[in-house]
Amino acid sequence: MILAHPQNKLENQLVKIFHSSNLPLHFNKTGNKEFTNYQRVSIIILLRRSGKSLRQFIDENLSESKWISWLGLKKIPKKSTLHDWLKLFSMKTIRQLFTLLIPKKVKLTAIDSTGIDSWRRSKHYEKRCEEFGEKKLPPMNYAKTSLFVDVEKKFILDWDLVMSHEHDVKIAERIFKRNKIKNIYGLGDKGFDSENLHEIARANGINFFAPVRKMNKRAFKDKRPKGFYRRQCKENPPEFKGMRSIVENVNYVLKETQIASLRSKKHSMRERELGWHLIFYNLKRVIGLTNSKEIQTFFILKIRIYVFPDNAPNSKNL
């Protein structure tokens, strides 16, 4: 892959990811080879960066973009072609690409769940239809997204997506079982208070803390919660427990700046859509950290205070 132009920072990271992923240039040995997998991955990430539909992205963003020459495209893909690319890469491949952007050194993590609109609909017209319409509109479906975040660098380490009302503990168990980073601390809110979750977390290298839920009013005040790890969380909470709010900040930034809603109708495609969004989010974090390392400036301000005697006459002599 020879690039005859100076790369921008996003393109540089895309090249690094593709070379590290060990994906072949083409999945097929014979047949049509108009597009390479590097071009497919790059265009899908650019699609998620735009936040537009497939047709709008092709007509407004890609048609007159420099990325056509940067990626070496022989022709602009059509909407149906781009849709086929979204189905081409499985969740296993997307997670493999995602793991390439995870930092190697992680000390403190946090987990939290949030809801994302999975059916884009105007709230204003929804309210007007309910006021004047004879029939109520069907309820809005929300995709429950749980994010496992590196607190220090704000990278997303893992995620899970469900369309049902599943408890936070069950989702966290799946995320912790997939964890491969050892000797780290984890933080969660009261929704993750479970002795079984503490055991799973420690079995997978996570020293997890979650505040204990409020007990029954009829219980004694000095009654201790059941479970060894739950008692530890109540009696010896860590000093950095307030850092859990950073995962809420990551959720807010992700929903306000990148994922307004999930456009896909099928759940399998929603998972892939969210996966590509999170890949682009971590790419932005990588680019942001490299920028901060390259442009680190320190200013030393010295302030000297000089004291001059006041030669004005005293008020008594006036």
Give a label for each model feature:
Residues 27-33, 70-71, 134, 264-266:
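A short glycine/serine-rich beta->alpha loop
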Residues 54-71:
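DNA-recognition alpha helix
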Residues 3-49:
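Basic, short loop/linker segments at the boundary and entry of helix-turn-helix/winged-helix-like folds
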Residues 32-33, 46-49, 59, 84, ...:
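Polybasic low-complexity intrinsically disordered regions
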Residues 190-257:
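Helix-centered, glycine/charged polyanion-binding patches within enzymatic domains
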Residues 232-318:
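Basic, amphipathic alpha-helical segments enriched in Lys/Arg and hydrophobic/aromatic residues
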Residues 69-89:
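Major-groove recognition helix of helix-turn-helix-like DNA-binding domains
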Residues 36-39, 61-63, 78:
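Non-catalytic DNA-binding core/recognition domains of DNA-processing enzymes
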